[in-house]
């Protein structure tokens, strides 16, 4: 009787083991089948990478900004946003949808997702870098615009002063503006020249900006009756607003510059092949599992 029971139990165990083995094999087969879609999505992603001229990043990021460079960087950002990221998201979604029904397949998926996440980090670091470059270009363009605004308002100040009837008020305002400009130049020279970027940020916040605010208040409180001198004052205040914008934007350019300095441009993916690290080893492992 005991023999019959033992034989029956063994038979059941063999059936269970066989069923488990079949389930595992079927799960691996299903994984391999769905992995083909992941591979296809990655090929499409690599094709986009090879066709949007990412390799130009090396050249563009290491040369002085020109109008042509600016347009190329903006075009690159649009290509990344409209073509590269959608293709990557499709690939990543396909990878995340790989089955994980059994322990072995779950382990396999976890191993591949490590590779997929490395690709994700690389792609989004690339996107971030291009975005920072465009930010830097935009801030530099803004600085140029604020400089032009400053000069334009200064010319208006000088023109209105020449038209003034009350020469005393005109002289008083001119003297005040010259004194303010000298004080600002001296402060800038003392605190900004030959200073490190972090020190420049602090100097602008703690010395330059408070001085400009004080000068605006001082000019606003000056008693003026002459129409042209009053117009000169208004333009002088606009001139100082341009200076405020100029220095605020300089702070932003420094922040962007600090972020850019932390990026190793040489390690950014610029061709499709650059995101294939570890793929061959994983594919070989998958092939061996299928052969068993």
Residue ranges, per PLM feature:
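Positively charged n-region of N-terminal signal peptides that target proteins for export
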Residues: 1-5
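C-terminal motif of bacterial Sec signal peptides marking the signal peptidase cleavage site
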Residues: 15-19
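Bacterial signal peptide processing site
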Residues: 21-23
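C-terminal amphipathic alpha-helix
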Residues: 34-63, 112-218, 228-292
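Post-signal peptide N-terminal segment of secreted/secretory-pathway proteins
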Residues: 60-124
């Amino acid at each position: 009787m005991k023999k019959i029971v033992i034989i029956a139990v063994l038979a059941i165990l063999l059936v269970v083991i066989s069923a488990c083995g079949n389930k595992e094999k079927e799960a691996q087969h299903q994984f391999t089948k769905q992995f083909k879609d992941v591979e296809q999505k990655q090929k499409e992603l690599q094709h986009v990478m090879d066709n949007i001229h990412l390799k130009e990043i090396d050249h563009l990021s290491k040369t002085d900004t020109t109008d042509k460079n600016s347009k190329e960087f903006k075009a690159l950002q649009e290509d990344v946003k409209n073509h590269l990221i959608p293709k990557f998201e499709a690939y990543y979604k396909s990878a995340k949808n790989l089955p994980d029904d059994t322990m072995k397949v779950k382990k396999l998926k976890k191993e591949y997702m490590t590779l997929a996440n490395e690709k994700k980090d690389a792609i989004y670091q690339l996107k971030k870098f291009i975005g920072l470059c465009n930010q830097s270009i935009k801030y530099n363009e803004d600085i140029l615009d604020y400089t032009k605004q400053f000069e334009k308002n200064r010319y208006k100040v000088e023109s209105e002063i020449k038209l003034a009837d009350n020469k005393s008020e005109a002289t008083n305002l001119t003297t005040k503006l010259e004194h303010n400009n000298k004080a600002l130049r001296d402060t800038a020279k003392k605190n900004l020249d030959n200073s490190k970027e972090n020190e420049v940020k602090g100097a602008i916040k703690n010395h330059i900006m408070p001085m400009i605010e004080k000068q605006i208040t001082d000019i606003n409180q000056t008693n003026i009756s002459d129409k042209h001198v009053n117009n000169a004052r208004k333009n002088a205040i606009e001139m100082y607003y341009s200076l405020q914008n100029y220095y605020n934007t300089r702070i932003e350019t420094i922040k962007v510059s600090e972020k850019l300095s932390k990026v190793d441009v040489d390690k950014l993916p610029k061709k499709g092949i650059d995101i294939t690290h570890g793929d061959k080893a994983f594919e070989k492992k998958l092939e061996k599992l299928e052969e068993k």
